[in-house]
Amino acid sequence: MDSYDLFRRLGAGAKFDVKRFSADATRFQVGKRKFDSESLEVLKGLDFFGNKKSVSDECGALQIHQEPPNEEKTQGVLLERSKEPKKKKRKKMTSEVPAQEDFDGGIQWTSSVEAKLQDEKVSGEKKLTSGKLEHLRKEKVNFFRNKHKIHVQGTDLPDPIATFQQLDQEYKINSRLLQNILDAGFQVPTPIQMQAIPVMLHGRELLASAPTGSGKTLAFSIPILMQLKQPTNKGFRALVISPTRELASQIHRELIKISEGTGFRIHMIHKAAIAAKKFGPKSSKKFDILVTTPNRLIYLLKQDPPGIDLTNVEWLVVDESDKLFEDGKTGFREQLASIFLACTSPKVRRAMFSATFAYDVEQWCKLNLDNVVSVSIGARNSAVETVEQELLFVGSETGKLLAMRELVKKGFKPPVLVFVQSIERAKELFHELIYEGINVDVIHAERTQQQRDNTVHSFRAGKIWVLICTALLARGIDFKGVNLVINYDFPTSSVEYIHRIGRTGRAGNRGKAVTFFTEDDKPLLRSVANVIQQAGCPVPEYIKGFQKLLSKQKKKMIKKPLERESICTTPKYFLEQAKQKKVAGQNSKKKETLKEKS
């Protein structure tokens, strides 16, 4: 036994790298073996067809005598071999691989077990069943959702989209609509758009939650326009409800922008009396989509006959759904119920959108919506991570005004939004800041609609640096480039806090939020501090030790906020004098008008 044979036996099933260990290969004569003349003679002497006879000589040595080839005998042997049952291809490959390698004297030896496994792997790749393909597809979809923090609940879930071009490939989107989306600067869909658009295009009812500034308006606008396909004269076929007129105006503007050139008639109710004539029973019904607030729509529905027809509505979208479902004076639950009942079409589908999940909204949707799909982005009821959040202790109510003036002295980068608890406090803070030499204005429900529109327009144009507002304006309004949000009065809940600070840090931009708090705000601190901590911002250690409020206490605080001291620094004596002068002036004007009439 030479070194080559010994190496082969010891290294059976192993692989040897000749290039890397060339010196050892030369030493042990590892390589393709060159057969000598004796080996070749032995090979020639092999009897494959039984034509040779072995005869022993006197010494007992084996001698081989070759007979002349017999054609008939050879053909018979071949016929017998052809009649033998053929082995399966896989088994044949398994048995032939090691034999061939042994014969060639190659370097790579593979055991029959390894060859069998390799063969099975190859055949498995060729014969992927439909079940395996479906499993692989689901794995890819789940990986994509996890990557973008998309959480989905429901049955038979549609796959998300990765690009807007997929809408053309899979859903045949109107080419003009797709071009409008791209021209508006929306190159890649946001996570909520990736999942919400396919869900609505499949005609599924939806409950969606995503952080502020994540593109929820576009997430329901695109599927509405795609499913309506083209304008018709059947009346309104899509209805979008929002809690404030400012938000409704913003949605209306976005819908008009992306539907340009498609022919859709998109309307908004400005004055109910004019709308009754425009959309009433005698109208031409040349309209497709309506964007409105609940109260204006209820006014039209309560008329006899109704001032608007909603029987052909196919999509009912409720934006800021958790606010609209609230009970009490600030909520719209009763109005929303009337609107739902007015949409009697069997084709109607409903979609709820908000930045925060409310438990009662979720339960209502599960009970009343048909096969609803729940979509949420990131952690539920969490603040957007692009906002730097800070809690600032100011001691008392007077400390808030001092802290505000200190911020003005240090300098700030406008525009700035300042949130207060009530309309009265908004007026008081406005009168205090107007003398600080900054462009400041106030917006609240007691101002006329024209005044509110002018204020919002001036703030967007940069003419106003600081805008004081109440919590209702925190819902959905998209002010471009807001750099700072100041919570002058502490929010009554973590949900309200999330919506307030969501006015900055929108569409991936950075922002900052500063929240003032006093000793009186101690019961509310823990819930807001948890939101700040989840977003990765620092929170003082002593706040983490505060007790949590019970659910009953939280509801009570929301319905009846803390009574706070007046912001106004003017002495009461001068305020009373000013009121008396104002009343006297009004009385004198009345007397003059009476004299003129007489």
From Swiss-Prot:
<dbReference type="GO" id="GO:0030490">
    <property type="term" value="P:maturation of SSU-rRNA"/>
</dbReference>
<dbReference type="Pfam" id="PF00270">
    <property type="entry name" value="DEAD"/>
</dbReference>
<feature type="domain" description="Helicase ATP-binding">
    <location>
        <begin position="197"/>
        <end position="375"/>
    </location>
</feature>
<dbReference type="GO" id="GO:0005524">
    <property type="term" value="F:ATP binding"/>
</dbReference>
<dbReference type="InterPro" id="IPR044764">
    <property type="entry name" value="DDX52/Rok1_DEADc"/>
</dbReference>
<feature type="modified residue" description="N6-acetyllysine">
    <location>
        <position position="15"/>
    </location>
</feature>
<comment type="similarity">
    <text>Belongs to the DEAD box helicase family. DDX52/ROK1 subfamily.</text>
</comment>
<dbReference type="InterPro" id="IPR001650">
    <property type="entry name" value="Helicase_C-like"/>
</dbReference>
<feature type="modified residue" description="Phosphoserine">
    <location>
        <position position="39"/>
    </location>
</feature>
<keyword id="KW-0067">ATP-binding</keyword>
<dbReference type="GO" id="GO:0003723">
    <property type="term" value="F:RNA binding"/>
</dbReference>
<dbReference type="Pfam" id="PF00271">
    <property type="entry name" value="Helicase_C"/>
</dbReference>
<keyword id="KW-0007">Acetylation</keyword>
<feature type="short sequence motif" description="Q motif">
    <location>
        <begin position="166"/>
        <end position="194"/>
    </location>
</feature>
<dbReference type="InterPro" id="IPR027417">
    <property type="entry name" value="P-loop_NTPase"/>
</dbReference>
<feature type="binding site">
    <location>
        <begin position="210"/>
        <end position="217"/>
    </location>
    <ligand>
        <name>ATP</name>
    </ligand>
</feature>
<dbReference type="InterPro" id="IPR014001">
    <property type="entry name" value="Helicase_ATP-bd"/>
</dbReference>
<dbReference type="InterPro" id="IPR011545">
    <property type="entry name" value="DEAD/DEAH_box_helicase_dom"/>
</dbReference>
<protein>
    <recommendedName>
        <fullName>Probable ATP-dependent RNA helicase DDX52</fullName>
        <ecNumber>3.6.4.13</ecNumber>
    </recommendedName>
</protein>
<keyword id="KW-0539">Nucleus</keyword>
<keyword id="KW-0347">Helicase</keyword>
<keyword id="KW-0547">Nucleotide-binding</keyword>
<keyword id="KW-0597">Phosphoprotein</keyword>
<feature type="domain" description="Helicase C-terminal">
    <location>
        <begin position="386"/>
        <end position="547"/>
    </location>
</feature>
<keyword id="KW-0694">RNA-binding</keyword>
<dbReference type="GO" id="GO:0016887">
    <property type="term" value="F:ATP hydrolysis activity"/>
</dbReference>
<feature type="short sequence motif" description="DEAD box">
    <location>
        <begin position="319"/>
        <end position="322"/>
    </location>
</feature>
<dbReference type="GO" id="GO:0003724">
    <property type="term" value="F:RNA helicase activity"/>
</dbReference>
<comment type="function">
    <text>Required for efficient ribosome biogenesis. May control cell cycle progression by regulating translation of mRNAs that contain a terminal oligo pyrimidine (TOP) motif in their 5' UTRs, such as GTPBP4.</text>
</comment>
<dbReference type="InterPro" id="IPR014014">
    <property type="entry name" value="RNA_helicase_DEAD_Q_motif"/>
</dbReference>
<dbReference type="GO" id="GO:0005730">
    <property type="term" value="C:nucleolus"/>
</dbReference>
<dbReference type="InterPro" id="IPR050079">
    <property type="entry name" value="DEAD_box_RNA_helicase"/>
</dbReference>
<keyword id="KW-0378">Hydrolase</keyword>
